[in-house]
Amino acid sequence: MNQLTAYTLRLGDNCLVLSQRLGEWCGHAPELEIDLALANIGLDLLGQARNFLSYAAELAGEGDEDTLAFTRDERQFSNLLLVEQPNGNFADTIARQYFIDAWHVALFTRLMESRDPQLAAISAKAIKEARYHLRFSRGWLERLGNGTDVSGQKMQQAINKLWRFTAELFDADEIDIALSEEGIAVDPRTLRAAWEAEVFAGINEATLNVPQEQAYRTGGKKGLHTEHLGPMLAEMQYLQRVLPGQQW
């Protein structure tokens, strides 16, 4: 697999896995409006995943977005560890969403300038959706943080719990570095300042605290995932595994 294919696959996997997680909220959100909002955000991410995975399949010269989504094993997925974390309670979902939304906005803003026209076009469409997603997640971060004692406590606990996965957002490997030097990709290390400016401001507005430095978790890009991804994929891929190639 060449570097551009691998890079595009990472972007698609992030969107696909997070979309699946948000879909698990359908019918279970705290209120109908939130249920619809999470479902719509999940559908936006699914659309982004289709665009990235379709392009990855085109670059690879085989398969399509369905092949990549439904026939790969856990170790073949290269998504960030953050997006595969369980929904938990509503505060957990909001913290996870806010962290990735802030990163997506920073990433797609830069990736629109990619020398690869397809990546630039996908990002130009995705940035509009990502900005809406960020408004939603930051809005709820502030509501929960400034709400009751219980909601504020749950929001702080969610931030503390998921903070260890945020360092991977800025972890650069040889693929990131090589493609960024060619003007195709974005070096994730250069996204930290924009992400921290947004996230620190959001946490401050929510009257919450930025967690202290801690032992961070990485490895998703290399296919080294937490125990949560495998069961999620088993459910997501079940039908194609049982009835390969079937259409409906």
Swiss-Prot record:
GO cellular component, one term: phenylacetyl-CoA 1,2-epoxidase complex
Pfam families noted in UniProt: PaaA_PaaC
Highest taxon above the source species: Bacteria
Binding positions (substrate): Q76, F77, S78, N79, I177, A178, L179
Coiled coil: none
Segments traversing the membrane: none
The protein's annotated pathway: Aromatic compound metabolism; phenylacetate degradation
Induction comment: Activated by cAMP receptor protein (CRP), integration host factor (IHF) and by phenylacetyl-coenzyme A (PA-CoA) that prevents PaaX from binding its target sequences. Inhibited by PaaX.
GO biological process, one term: phenylacetate catabolic process
Record's subunit section: Forms a stable heterotetramer (dimer of heterodimers) with PaaA and a stable heterodimer with PaaB.
Protein's job: Component of 1,2-phenylacetyl-CoA epoxidase multicomponent enzyme system which catalyzes the reduction of phenylacetyl-CoA (PA-CoA) to form 1,2-epoxyphenylacetyl-CoA. The subunit C may be essential for structural integrity of the alpha subunit.
Name under which the protein is recorded: 1,2-phenylacetyl-CoA epoxidase, subunit C
Originating organism: Escherichia coli (strain K12)
This protein's encoding gene: paaC
